[in-house]
Every structure is written in C-alpha cells, then in structure tokens.
C-alpha cells in the first residue's frame, strides 16, 4: 500500500488476532512496560515477523484524534440537565467545545452536534466516548469527522 492509501475506522471485534496483538505490542512499547520489541512480542504471543508486517498499518483511533477537532453527533432525551452533563464530561476530560448546535426537540429528543478540540484531553477518545455514552439521556453518539 502506498503512502496515500485510504484510512478506515474498524471496530476492534472484527480485527484479526494478529492485528490485535500488533496493537498490544505497540501499547506495551509506548507505555514503557517492556523495553524491547522481542520482549513485547513474546509477552503478547505474536511472531516478530507478524509484528513488523503490520506495525506501520494499524493504529488505535486515539492516535489520529489527539490534538485535533472532532465533531460528534448526538441524540439526547429532552430532559433538564442532559446537555449539561455532556458538557461536564467534556470539561472534566479537558476537552474544549469549539461549536455546539442543538435542534428543536421533537418527540422527546433533540439532535446535538458538538465540535471539540482534543489537544489537552487527558483520556483516550475511546474512554471519552464511553463516558459520554453512559450519561443519562444519551441515546446515540456518532463521530462525524475530524
């Protein structure tokens, strides 16, 4: 694949074991839990050749989102405090709201689009999205773009 290859976001559940293990090796190395590639591949149970084959082609989504502006689309229950709890999660993660737009509520729900600067965020995007999704009144969250 060339440098201009297309990028895709793929759910972890459908990744092959080799790709998952490659990501785990990279995580161990970046965290400093292991010192060498050889040590990491032995711990994870993947061959060095498989690691080298995939290492430049598989990355966690958070690698591409850190320090960028992400745009989220949400469907929220039209209840007091729901949007406020979303904004609290953003603030507690040290995200910075760039834009926010809420539609008029209809049939008990409202659509909200929020653009967030992730430069200073102190948690991974995955954890951030899980935290948002777990808030009362959140029905749906989608990443629209970066």
Curated annotation (Swiss-Prot):
CDD domains: ACT_PheB-BS
Natural source organism: Thermoanaerobacter pseudethanolicus (strain ATCC 33223 / 39E)
Family indicated by similarity: Belongs to the UPF0735 family.
Signal peptide extent: none
Chain ranges of the ACT domain: 71-146
Database matches in InterPro entries: ACT-like_dom_sf (IPR045865), ACT_dom (IPR002912), UPF0735_ACT_dom-cont (IPR008310)
HAMAP family, sorted: UPF0735
Protein's name according to its UniProt entry: UPF0735 ACT domain-containing protein Teth39_0139
């Amino acid at each position: 694949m060339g440098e201009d290859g297309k990028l895709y976001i793929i759910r972890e559940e459908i990744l092959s074991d080799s790709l998952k293990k490659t990501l785990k090796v990279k995580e161990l190395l970046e965290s400093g839990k292991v010192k060498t590639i050889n040590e990491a591949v032995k711990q994870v149970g993947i061959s060095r050749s498989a690691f080298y084959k995939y290492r430049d082609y598989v990355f966690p989504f958070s690698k591409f989102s850190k320090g960028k502006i992400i745009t989220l689309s949400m469907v929220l229950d039209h209840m007091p405090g729901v949007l406020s709890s979303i904004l609290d999660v953003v603030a507690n993660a040290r995200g910075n709201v760039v834009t926010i737009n809420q539609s008029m509520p209809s049939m008990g729900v409202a659509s909200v689009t929020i653009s967030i600067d992730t430069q200073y965020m102190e948690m991974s995007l995955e954890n951030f999205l899980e935290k948002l999704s777990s808030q009362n009144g959140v029905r749906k969250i989608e990443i629209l773009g970066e």
